Amino acid sequence: MPEAAVLIDPVPTMDAEAEVVHPVGIEMVHRTRPEDAFPRNWVRLGRDRFAVEAVLPHDHPFFAPVGDDLHDPLLVAEAMRQAAMLAFHAGYGIPLGYHFLLTELDYVCHPEHLGVGGEPTEIGLEVFCSDLKWRAGLPAQGRVGWAVHRGDRLAATGVAATRFSTPKAYRRMRGDVPVEGISLPETAPVPASPAGRARVEDVVLSGTGREGVWELRVDTRHPTLFQRPNDHVPGMLLLEAARQAACLVAGPAGIVPVEARTRFHRYSEFGSPCWIGAVVQPGADEDTVTVRVTGHQDGETVFSTVLSGPRAHG
């Protein structure tokens, strides 16, 4: 993604507002459907620390349980992402309508603390913001970290790098790209089960006839992956494509991606094929699968990620 300008604004003064609990509107986490918004309330713990209470659903149609009745690690990652957007909007005053651009996203889940058990799970996310660069009194880029707790147990951790763009600056950066992209799949999906999915409508890969390479299958009608008009393919869809490719190369047992290290290099555009390649990495642990996944479009790298985790079945 394009580099941000050099930022030299001083850090503004900010009251801590410690221990004031605030409810969460779904617009603060960039969702339009309540069932896809997971944070419930937040409180500022310090200048750059926030506590967010969230609920992981047990019956979400897209983020369904995986493996041996575990919450999907990508659901946990999405809860992290939403908690970060909430902290920056509500805690730092970044206006709604600004663009939230992740360039890095790493997470580690502890599956022994992610059992579903047939009911929603309440979690607490501590959000840490650091290395903030400021422009006109607002953060323009920075890093964010998460610690996810289920009761007194650490269920996951994560770190990310992010940038923020005003609507005007974003349109200038994007140039002539249409504001609203529409994409309907023209190719058949791969079979759902080997890709780690139960429903064919959630499959985001099409076969190419080449081993370890698929075409990204983009359907802007998907209610969870496309919440509102967008001018590029969302990062959530790219992560899902990576998971599905990893399942396909891992073999019949698939993979539960409890760890991920992801870099987003540029936008994936509508109207041009994006090729997803996956290769199993060598490892000494027979119970863990590690897969490197990359996305390429028009000869450029869109994203790269390394997913690791136990086999989903067996």
UniProtKB/Swiss-Prot annotation:
Record field: pH dependence: Optimum pH is 6.5-7.5.
EC code(s) of this entry: 2.3.1.277
SUPFAM superfamilies cross-referenced by the UniProt entry: Thioesterase/thiol ester dehydrase-isomerase
EC supergroup of this enzyme: transferase
InterPro entries for this protein: AfsA-like, AfsA_hotdog_dom, HotDog_dom_sf
UniProt name for this protein: 2-oxo-3-(phosphooxy)propyl 3-oxoalkanoate synthase
Similarity remark: Belongs to the AfsA family.
Keyword Transcription: no
Reactions that this protein is recorded to catalyse: a medium-chain 3-oxoacyl-[ACP] + dihydroxyacetone phosphate = a (4-alkanoyl-5-oxo-2,5-dihydrofuran-3-yl)methyl phosphate + holo-[ACP] + H2O
Keywords (A to Z) from UniProt: Transferase
Subunit record text: Monomer.
Function: Involved in the biosynthesis of A factor (2-isocapryloyl-3R-hydroxymethyl-gamma-butyrolactone), a gamma-butyrolactone autoregulator that triggers secondary metabolism and morphogenesis in Streptomyces. Catalyzes beta-ketoacyl transfer from 8-methyl-3-oxononanoyl-acyl carrier protein (ACP) to the hydroxyl group of dihydroxyacetone phosphate (DHAP), thus producing an 8-methyl-3-oxononanoyl-DHAP ester.
Phylogenetic lineage: Bacteria, Bacillati, Actinomycetota, Actinomycetes, Kitasatosporales
Thermal behaviour (record text): Optimum temperature is 15 degrees Celsius.
Single GO molecular function: transferase activity
Domain of life according to the entry: Bacteria
